[in-house]
Amino acid sequence: MQTRNTFSWIREEITRSISVSLMIYIITWASISSAYPIFAQQNYENPREATGRIVCANCHLANKPVDIEVPQTVLPDTVFEAVVKIPYDMQLKQVLANGKKGALNVGAVLILPEGFELAPPDRISPEMKEKIGNLSFQNYRPDKKNILVIGPVPGQKYSEITFPILAPDPATNKDVHFLKYPIYVGGNRGRGQIYPDGSKSNNTVYNATAGGIISKILRKEKGGYEITIVDASNERQVIDIIPRGLELLVSEGESIKLDQPLTSNPNVGGFGQGDAEIVLQDPLRVQGLLFFLGSVVLAQIFLVLKKKQFEKVQLSEMNF
């Protein structure tokens, strides 16, 4: 009887341990997923607002350059490269969520015309695969195959991101036409300053929420500070919480004003957006152009031959 109770107790403990481990895994996985800079997918139906502004700029407040290179023209049902360049100083270090310094990561969103989409693996050439590396692209939404996102990925390795794109074929997709189309891109380097819920990260400036005298600065055990501000007019105390990793600009006994910076600005990254144009070219139009150019060349050749023949006739008449 005692042995049976012992086995029952062991079985309950194992079940409880598995349940706890599973819960920890789910919570950890969720926090990792939500930590990716693809927050726009969770909060915006379309990453590009009606004003043309890409919503990533809501979290990445600093303005930095980004560039995109695409062919001027592409033929239907062909694969081409869209290269997004996110330049920055590789020597820079950013403040990580744990307060330590680390390398910058990068991310990008590519908004293609309707009908254009990520090329399937079997259509990508070995040379293009080598340029892509180990990158894994995602659709912004299952029904928005023309909008692609990537990141975060190590900036030192992927400051240039090559997207393999498959051009549509108007012969099979009646919604696509042989026209000039715009392509929009947004790219960030480094962490954002604002989370989607509106709260600040530790990668931005923290300002005083009240004016007065700093009566106390408490350094927290796990990093960060609690700054107590006393309003001299009514003795009201306000405590501002500063997360770890930030450098203070103030000291105890100092008089400060409302919204005065309490920390330096740690942000070394930023977000930028750009655009390009691409022409989906009709192959028949290309063939017609080649035929026309060939006709012009042949006409020039016949003209030269005719001129030489005429000169020979003139020369023979003069000799006669």
Swiss-Prot record:
Transmembrane segments: 286-306
Cofactor(s), names only, from the UniProt record: heme
Primary location class: plastid
Alphabetical list of Gene3D superfamilies matching this protein: 2.40.50.100, Cytochrome f large domain, Single helix bin
Cofactor binding note from Swiss-Prot or TrEMBL: Binds 1 heme group covalently.
SUPFAM superfamilies: Cytochrome f subunit of the cytochrome b6f complex, transmembrane anchor (SSF103431), Cytochrome f, large domain (SSF49441), Rudiment single hybrid motif (SSF51246)
Single GO cellular component term: chloroplast thylakoid membrane
GO biological process, one term: photosynthesis
Domain of life: Eukaryota
InterPro entries recorded: Cyt-f_TM, Cyt_f, Cyt_f_lg_dom, Cyt_f_lg_dom_sf, Rudment_hybrid_motif
Keyword list, A-Z: Chloroplast, Electron transport, Heme, Iron, Membrane, Metal-binding, Photosynthesis, Plastid, Signal, Thylakoid, Transmembrane, Transmembrane helix, Transport
Positions of heme binding: Y36, C56, C59, H60
Topology of this chain in the membrane: Single-pass membrane protein
Localization terms from the record: Plastid, Chloroplast thylakoid membrane
Signal peptide range in chain numbering: 1-35
GO molecular-function terms, A-Z: electron transfer activity; heme binding; iron ion binding
Family statement drawn from the similarity comment of this UniProt entry: Belongs to the cytochrome f family.
PANTHER family documented for this protein: CYTOCHROME F (PTHR33288:SF10), PTHR33288
Quaternary structure note: The 4 large subunits of the cytochrome b6-f complex are cytochrome b6, subunit IV (17 kDa polypeptide, petD), cytochrome f and the Rieske protein, while the 4 small subunits are PetG, PetL, PetM and PetN. The complex functions as a dimer.
Function noted in UniProt: Component of the cytochrome b6-f complex, which mediates electron transfer between photosystem II (PSII) and photosystem I (PSI), cyclic electron flow around PSI, and state transitions.
Protein name listed in UniProt: Cytochrome f
Organism: Nasturtium officinale (Watercress)
Biological classification of the source: Eukaryota, Viridiplantae, Streptophyta, Embryophyta, Tracheophyta
